[in-house]
Regions:
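C-terminal capping/lid region of NAD(P)-dependent oxidoreductase domains
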Residues: 1-4, 237, 312-316, 328-348
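Glycine-rich phosphate-binding loop and adjacent beta-alpha segment
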Residues: 194, 202-205, 247-316, 345-348
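Glycine-rich beta-strand-centered segment in the early N-terminal region that forms part
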Residues: 23-40, 52-101, 139-141
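Mid-domain Rossmann-like dinucleotide-binding core that forms the NAD(H)/NADP(H) cofactor-binding site
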Residues: 142-225
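N-terminal Rossmann-like NAD(P) cofactor-binding module of classical short-chain dehydrogenase/reductase
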Residues: 87, 243-244
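Short amphipathic alpha-helix with an adjacent loop that forms part of the alpha/beta core around
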Residues: 226-236
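NAD(P)H dinucleotide-binding glycine-rich loop of Rossmann-like/cofactor-binding domains
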Residues: 35, 92-178
Length: 348
């Protein structure tokens, strides 16, 4: 079968389209083989190509998000059958450690991600466990392959950040950095569902205008404005109750300056770098909570799928690229031009 692979880490020139062996014909008892119709890119895929501190088995197939059609099921699969239209939850737990038994699947000692630790979705067919698959809900208008592929990773990540970890409440002020990416746009929608007052930033006025149309209460250009000062002015010097920062080094200091007393800063990554610091005296005096968040558990995934079916969390697709042009999709993501998810159409 055809797949986009990397044979070494480095730049985007390492990505190539080639033939790879198809998944084994014999499935495990709870495994499902899915024919991929569309795959969506995430910053994780850029990090994989550049070289995460992992031992890859080359050639490695990137891609965490995907949607497609069930081709075959293992003997003990009870909830799916061939022909079902499905989307994938890329975070795979082993269901045997103490964290899994407590329902904290994203803390699993053997947690693995499609496209990172395992072969990914930039291919024609993948095998994943039954519990990592959801039937695509029926919506009007129908959810297309691109939207279904764009849904899982960013929505699950944003849901856990805002609902489970930061516990955003009605009337709170939430600051979201870097509107335009999939996680930040999902966070925007979830924060509005929670009844928050929403401040978002971007260096692109076009993205800020789009965010306003999507429900942002205030938009700030972090290329021309001092974000912490603006947030303090907007909140009568109180600061934000919650700051959503997945940018990292470039925004960390400003995030803390914008954070109010008793505030919560929640992070799922560091696209500009992982090394940050702060004065511990400010941490305990202002009684801040600094929260990490990664993906989500099975209950959270079921909840976001349910809400998608209710029409609440429909993802935003920036652009769809043909399978043959996947490298161009990576390049668009790397330039930060997107407003929503960059998707690759694998098959019709």
């Amino acid at each position: 079968m055809r797949a986009w692979v990397i044979r070494a880490t480095g730049g985007l020139d390492q990505i190539e389209l080639t033939d790879v062996p198809s998944p084994a014909a014999t499935l495990g008892p709870r495994d499902v083989r899915v024919g991929i119709r569309a795959a969506a890119l995430n910053h994780l895929d850029l990090f994989v190509v550049q070289g995460l501190p992992l031992e890859y088995r080359f050639p490695h197939i990137p891609g965490a998000d995907g949607a497609g059609v069930v081709e075959a099921v293992g003997r003990d699969v009870a909830t799916l059958r061939p022909g079902d239209r499905v989307m994938l939850n890329p975070g795979i737990a082993d269901y045997s450690c103490e964290y899994c038994r407590a329902g904290a699947h994203s803390l699993c000692r053997n947690y693995r991600m499609l496209g990172e630790h395992l072969p990914g979705t930039l291919t024609e067919s993948v095998v994943v466990p039954e519990q990592n698959i959801a039937v695509i809900p029926t919506l009007v208008p129908p959810l297309g392959w691109a939207e279904a592929a764009a849904f899982s990773l960013v929505t699950l990540t944003a849901w856990r950040m805002l609902v489970t970890r930061a516990q955003v409440r009605v009337g709170e002020t939430v600051l979201i950095w870097g509107i335009g990416g999939g996680v930040s746009l999902a966070a925007l929608r979830i924060a509005k569902l929670r009844g928050a007052n929403l401040i978002v930033t971007s260096s692109s006025d076009a993205k800020l205008q789009a965010a306003k149309r999507l429900g942002a209460d205030v938009t700030l250009n972090h290329g021309t404005q001092k974000i912490s000062q603006e947030v303090r002015a907007l909140t009568n010097k109180r600061g934000a109750d919650v700051v959503v920062d997945s940018v990292g080094e470039a925004t960390w200091d400003e995030s803390l300056r914008a954070l109010g007393r008793g505030g919560r800063l929640v992070s799922c990554g560091g696209t500009t770098g992982p090394k940050v610091g702060f004065d511990l005296r400010r941490l305990f005096w202002y009684q801040w909570s600094i929260l990490g968040s990664t993906m989500g558990n099975d209950a959270e995934y079921r909840e976001i799928v349910r809400r998608l079916g209710a029409g609440e969390l429909r993802p935003i697709v920036d652009r769809v690229f043909p399978f043959a042009d996947a490298r161009a999709a990576f390049e668009r993501l790397a330039r930060g031009e997107q407003l929503g998810k960059v998707v690759i159409q694998v098959a019709d």
